[in-house]
């Protein structure tokens, strides 16, 4: 039996682990948190920091592993591309391309040169240089650590004082101490998730993003959006242009963007599975086998026999149950008006476990489906009020 290494075992990778086993692979997970739920689904767990590309390469060689699948983190993508390149494996972009796409400064520079619409960024490595720059800018701006995901190391600034604080935050959070400063674009934040085969988009889904508790961390999403067809076509053309320019491999390609004055401004991109089992929701509204396609693409298997299914719902989404303070959680209740729409639920915290970072931690995830989009939107906007979380302290 061939051995496959997946670079983490969190909730986000659980469906990939299950898919790899369905495909007949002896599935090994890594990562440095042994308590993650996905490790129990795998055949074996080998602890390692998946951002340490040399450590992962050593594991691959010592354990006669045959192929590698990235995780829901940019560092994991960079590592998987590096290891695949060293081992001569198919299914992954070059290490150089992985860096271009998952380091904010390199990516923004690349797409600006390519002529794609994006907020114009300026890259910094020193506090003093950036401090001088923010005396001259038009506010608001946004400051982003160069190499982090999930909203970490990102702050909006509406004046010089806030900008200096945001710069210090980005420097302290980034592993490289590099960060970007760019104009804050006012508009609707959305994502487009596609699967690319032979540099052409063959499956696509758009979603609205909601971040009511932490403005830099998506808490809820709803698929599909009412995206203007011209906007969607422009995004598809941008994705295919990037794929052709960099000679990218088959796989997931996601763009996060802001629609302002009817035009999309690209702000982030990802070549990996998304967090919170997003692909489960994407399958619900498209019928496309996202997890199967991703795993097969990254291990170099044939994609010609992928089968589309009838979509589960017209609209679907996910919501991470969060709270507005730290403390010990006793439990939570979901009202019937929402419960009847839920098709999947995953508890993250057990009763009496502690929340110590309420701006980022989730109590549970719920996955819901609707036939009426306005009903879904109205409910999503009230979820933090109608889902009752009880504290034990």
Language-model-detected regions and their locations in the chain:
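Active-site "cap" helix and flanking loop/linker of ATP-utilizing ligase/carboxylase catalytic domains
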Residues: 234-255, 260-261, 270-326
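Internal nucleotide-binding/catalytic subdomain
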Residues: 156-261
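A conserved helix-loop-beta module that forms one wall/lid of the active-site cleft
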Residues: 85-153
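Peripheral (often C-terminal) accessory segments that flank ATP-dependent C-N-forming ligase machineries
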Residues: 295-393
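Glycine-rich phosphate-binding loop signature in dinucleotide/nucleotide-binding domains
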Residues: 59-65, 135-137, 174
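Short, well-ordered beta-strand elements within core beta-sheets of diverse protein domains
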Residues: 183, 227, 283, 363-371
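Protein kinase-like catalytic core scaffold
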Residues: 202, 265-268
């Amino acid at each position: 039996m061939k051995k496959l290494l997946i670079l983490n075992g969190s909730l986000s990778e659980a469906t990939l682990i299950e898919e790899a086993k369905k495909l007949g692979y002896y599935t090994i997970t890594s990562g440095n948190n042994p308590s993650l739920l996905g490790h129990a689904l795998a055949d074996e767990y080998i602890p390692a920091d998946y951002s340490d590309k040399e450590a992962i390469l050593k594991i691959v060689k010592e354990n006669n592993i045959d192929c590698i699948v990235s995780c829901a983190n940019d560092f994991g993508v960079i590592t998987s591309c590096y290891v695949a390149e060293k081992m001569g494996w198919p299914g992954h972009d070059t290490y150089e391309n992985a860096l271009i796409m998952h380091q904010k400064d390199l990516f923004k520079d690349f797409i600006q040169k390519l002529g794609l619409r994006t907020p114009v960024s300026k890259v910094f490595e020193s506090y003093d240089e950036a401090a001088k720059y923010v005396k001259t800018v038009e506010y608001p701006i946004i400051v982003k650590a160069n190499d982090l995901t999930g909203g970490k190391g990102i702050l909006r600034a509406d004046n010089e004082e806030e900008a200096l604080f945001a710069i210090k935050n980005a420097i302290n959070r980034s592993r490289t101490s590099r960060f970007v400063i760019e104009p804050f674009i006012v508009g609707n934040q959305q994502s487009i998730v596609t699967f690319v085969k032979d540099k052409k988009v063959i499956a696509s889904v758009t979603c609205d993003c909601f971040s009511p508790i932490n403005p830099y961390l998506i808490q809820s999403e709803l698929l599909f959006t009412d995206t203007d067809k011209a906007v969607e076509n422009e995004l598809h053309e941008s994705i295919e242009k990037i794929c052709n320019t960099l000679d990218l491999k088959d796989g997931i390609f996601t763009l996060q963007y802001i629609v302002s004055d009817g035009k999309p401004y690209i702000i982030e991109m990802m070549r990996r599975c998304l967090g919170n089992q997003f692909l489960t929701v994407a399958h619900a509204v498209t019928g496309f086998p996202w997890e199967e396609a991703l795993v097969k693409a990254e291990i170099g298997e044939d994609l010609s026999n992928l089968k589309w299914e009838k979509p589960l719902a017209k609209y679907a989404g996910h919501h991470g149950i969060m709270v507005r303070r730290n403390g010990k959680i006793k439990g939570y209740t979901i009202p019937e008006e929402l419960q009847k729409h839920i098709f999947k639920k995953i508890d993250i915290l057990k009763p009496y476990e502690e929340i110590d970072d309420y701006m980022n931690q989730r109590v549970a995830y719920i996955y819901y489906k609707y036939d009426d989009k306005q009903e879904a939107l109205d409910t999503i906007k009230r979820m933090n009020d109608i889902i009752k979380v009880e504290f034990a302290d």
